[in-house]
Structures are given as structure tokens and as C-alpha cells.
Amino acid sequence: MYLQQHTFLVFCYRSEFYTLERRQSLFGFRYRFVTTEAMPQQRNSLEELCEQVCVDGTLLMNVIQQAAIPEWSDPVWETYEAVRHNATVHGREIHFSYRGRDYWISHTKEGRSYLSDDFDNMQAFGSCRELFENARINGNTLKDIWGETIVDAC
């Protein structure tokens, strides 16, 4: 299986993005299911995780069977949901343009997140989740403007 050779897998289910992770501990591997919004669910085996964790009332094992794993070149990775997941869960920096201006989302090791633009304006937030909830460009939320953005890197 994929997680035996890789440490994580990001997939899409019902337009939301999720991550399965394999982590080494003192007692062997632990497996985590990570959503953009909720606390991660962790179990001692992938089987336990798939049999005990639900997504909107559906067992994870059934979710995985219906999930899409887009190619990295697929434009779905530039959607608001994918970018928010990758920034929030994986700490990825995001570079995008909106109406001719360049913006980027960055993070510190301490967990703070920033939305900056090419005129040295910066909005600081205590977390990436807070950034995606409260950041504004021209008075609009990131979710509201995302359809007009061009993603350069995520």
C-alpha cells in the first residue's frame, strides 16, 4: 500500500481534502487521519483507523474507496479547499495573484501565519486556520475571491 512507502497521502472526498499519515513512534508506526478543521484522529494501525473513524457518518474505509487522489498536475490542487488544507495541515507556503497583485501565505515555526502582498502589506494571525477565516483582500475573504486568483505555488 501507498503508506508503506510514503509518510502521507492527501485525497479528496466530496470536495474536501484529507490526509492520512504514517508516523514512527517508540512503539512502531502510528496512523493519523487529518482534516482541515478538526483535531487529528490517531490509531495504532491503519486498519483500526479505517474501522473506527468516520467522515460525515461514513467509515473511513468506505470514504477511501470513494475518494479521488488527483495527480499533482491536476488543477484541483489550486482550489480554495485544497490550498487551505495544504497550508493548514502541511504548512505549505502559497503564492497567488489576484487582480494584478501578488500575494503569499507563509508560516513561522511558532505557528503564526501571514498574508503578505507585493506592496509589503502584511496581515498576521495566530494560526493558519485563523488566517483563512479572517484574512481580507479589499474587504473580501480569501474564499470569496479565490475563483479569481491564479495560484503560482502551493
Where are the regions that the model predicts?
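Mixed-charge, low-complexity intrinsically disordered regions
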Residues: Q52, Y80-V89
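Mixed-charge, Lys/Arg-enriched low-complexity segments
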Residues: P40-T79, A124-C154
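Intrinsically disordered, low-complexity regulatory segments enriched in Ser/Thr/Pro
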Residues: L26-E51, E110-R129
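Amphipathic, interaction-prone secondary-structure segments
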Residues: L3-V34, V89-S116
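Charged, amphipathic alpha-helical segments
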Residues: M1, E16-F17, S73-A82, R99
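Short, Φ-rich (hydrophobic/aromatic) sequence segments
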Residues: M1-Q5, R84-T88, W146
